[in-house]
Amino acid sequence: FEAGVTKDQFDNDRMFIGINHEGFEWKLEPGELLEIPEAVMVFSASGLGHMTRTFHDLYRNHLIRSGWKYMPRPVLINNWEATHFDFDSDKLIEIAERAADKGIEMFVMDDGWFGHRNSDNGSLGGWVVNKNKIKGGLKHLVNRNNSMGMKFGIWFEPEMVSPDSDLYRMHPDWVMEYHGREGTQVRNQYVLDLTRPETVDYVYESIASVLR
C-alpha cells in the first residue's frame, strides 16, 4: 500500500492512500474479485481537534451499527493489572465487589480465562472456559457480577492464534503467511487469515458458543 501528500503547481494539496500503483499487481481470473481494506478520511480547516470531532461524528452517525453509539460508555475495570494470568473466579469476584462499592459500572475479565492460558505461550484460538479457574462456570460468574449491579465483559483476541494451541495444530494453514517464507511470531502468536471463510466461521462459532 501507499499513502502520501502531494502539492501541484497551483498550490493544491492532494492526499491519497491505497494500492501502490508502482509495485502492486494481482492477476484476476474471469469472475474473480479483489477486496481491499477501506480507507476513511476526513478534512478540517480548523485544526486537529475539529478533525477528531469530525471523525467521531462520521463514525457515530453513519458507520457504527451498535446500539451503544449514542449512549454513554460505562465506567469499567478489568483485572489485568491486578492479576495478569494468576486468577480464579474467587479473586475476580473480590475485585468486582470492591469495584462495585466504588460505583464502577462494568467488570471485564481479561486474558487467561480459557484453555491452559497461564502465560502468553499458548492457547490463543481455543476459546474454551478453563473450569479450574472459572469455578462453577462462566454463567455463575456473570450472574454473581450482575447481582452487584454491574455489567460483565470478556476479553477476546479473535484474530490471533498460538502455535501451542489445538487450532494451530489442526489448521496451521489458517495463519497469515507468505508462501515459501517462515512465519513471524510476535508474543508467541500468529495472525489468523480472516480472508478465509472457514477461519471466520470458526472464530465466530467458537466465540458465540462462549457467549450463548
Kindly label every feature range from the protein language model.
Residues 91-114:
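Catalytic domains of carbohydrate-active enzymes, especially glycoside hydrolases
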Residues 55-75:
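Long, charged amphipathic helices and adjacent flexible linkers at domain junctions
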Residues 92-97, 138-142, 207-208:
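Generic structural signal for well-ordered alpha-helices
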Residues 72-74, 81-85, 158-212:
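Active-site-adjacent "subsite" loops/lids of carbohydrate-active enzymes
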Residues 114-169:
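Acidic/aromatic-lined carbohydrate-recognition and catalytic surfaces
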Residues 1-59:
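N-terminal accessory beta-strand-rich subdomains and adjacent acidic, glycine-rich linkers
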